[in-house]
Amino acid sequence: MNKKVVILGGGTGTSTLVRGLKQFPVDISVVVSVCDDGKSTGKLREEFDIPAVGDLRKVIASLSDTEPLFESLLEYRFNTNSDLNGHAVGNLLLAALCNITGNMSDGIKSLSKVLNLKGKVLPLTEDNVVLMGLMQDGSTVEGEHNITESKKRIKDIYYKKNPVINPEVIEDIKQADMIILSMGSLYTSIACDLISKDVTDAIDASKGKILYVCNMFTQPGETDDFTVSDHVQVLNSYLGKRKIESLIINDGKIPKKFINKYHREEDKDPVVIDKSNLNNMNLKIIKDDFVTLDLGSLKHDAIKLSLKIFEEIIN
């Protein structure tokens, strides 16, 4: 029987992870935060009163086992002067299926059959949630997009109204052999999955190991100047009684030209590995060179990363 893995996250980082992990003999459930409110997703949320679909779409595309053309179709964005401008086909498809089936979870299950998904994709909630940010300067910012765009340091996040958590999320977490906090936006993709007590209670009740894959670069508006231990401390502050047990970090050399490029164009810098702080955190630290180049962007090597995770799962 395959080991059960629950991944909490969303967006590009989680998509990279599942693209590799689906190649291994594990049962994957991906819990996706649904508080994104920018671009196409924001328009659809406002018009149809549905959970955010953008991160769900990315993870579904990465888990699919079908013709590459279908994955390209899900990710295709219209560039037109009409009302379709900026919308991704996958976002429209999920919005339509949500209306047809009556909820997002059933809509995703219908699409999963068509795309032969190598795992489950679970929205954290069916509610049209609004993420709130309490900033270090005492101000409050409403909405995920506004939180990151405010360029203020985040002190805390919470939901404007506490959502009803998807029961399948709770059940899968309790049965998991490993719970992975994915690389990705620290507050708006991962921590926002942990701010519900129902989720942290389920993690506390689970016997699954808690593993965190740290980002390679900081993210403007969320983790400026953060070290690896800063990332861990933030996530541990949102977890319940149980904390992160294993940590995967990249110690591969990042080419100088990419460090300069990311700093200049995106205001991102490599996350510093602060060994002295990490050594005092009671963590199993797994280091390797995970750097790879994909279409001109630096990413974690999905297969190499997944192999390390699989070794942890079976040990």
Question: What do the PLM-derived regions correspond to, one by one?
Answer:
Residues P25-V26, S206-I210, I244, L283:
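A short helix->loop->beta-strand "cap" motif at the edges of active sites that frequently abuts
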Residues C35-K151, K308-E311:
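Electropositive, gly/pro-rich neighborhoods at or near active sites that engage anionic ligands
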Residues S29-S33, K209-M216, E245-G252:
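Short internal beta-strands
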